[in-house]
Amino acid sequence: MPAAGDAKTAVVLLDTRQHTPDHEHAVHLKLADGLAQLLGCAHVHLDPPSTPSDRYYYLPTETLIDPQRHAALGIRTEQDLFGGLVAFPYMATKAISHPLPAAASFPPGWTDAFALQASDALLRGYTVFSKADARNAAHLLLLDGPLRIKPVLACAGRGQQVIDTLDALEPLLADMDDQDLAVWGLVLEEDLSEVQTFSVGQVRVAGLTCSYHGTQQLTHDHQGT
């Protein structure tokens, strides 16, 4: 079986979403072309599943969950994909950014470790995995002012709501599936009226390391949101 460091034969776009918007798909294809140039291999988009012996380098459209499952494709280390691979669903979302409220329920594998380490760079908030815990967290946060409800599977600010009373939380919770909430979680965070969000990160591919920083900006999509 090829080792993780063996030369890759192709870059494969691994689209795990039910629906990917056309503009995002175009970006993924462009990124796959660039990765293929860096790795010195072809760019292909295969529908049939591959095997470890194919020695592909994968570009997933979202963070992959369950290392054992994706090992069947040959994805075992960072040298096998441009993206993330985590053990539990909540690790793939913003749920890791905040601790639980006291005595809250939590899914398998949960840890507050990252939230505690990053607390100096984050707003005050909580992650919850049940509606009862959401009410408790909201009560605590509302003591200091309005709070923001942040669905963890949404991106670019979509689906977020600001509330200033507990009563305003109830219709939002009513629309949430209890099972999905127990798996993925929900973030409740203090709300800021004027925000400047900085981003930092680092990527590694083909023996190269690239670090970046910048300031986030929001734009309107085709729905005007």
Give, region by region, the residue ranges found by the protein language model.
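Active-site nucleotide/adenylate-binding loops and adjacent lid/helix of ATP-dependent enzymes
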Residues: I96-V187, S193, V203-L208, G214-T225
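Short helix-terminating capping/connector loops at secondary-structure junctions
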Residues: G5-D6, S50-P52, L181-A182
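Short beta-strand scaffold segments in enzyme catalytic cores
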Residues: F198-Q202
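Short hydrophobic beta-strand segments
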Residues: P2-E24, D54-P60
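Short, glycine/charged-enriched secondary-structure capping and boundary segments
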Residues: A26, A72-L73, V162-D164
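Conserved N-proximal alpha/beta basic substrate-recognition cap immediately N-terminal to
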Residues: L29, D33-D144
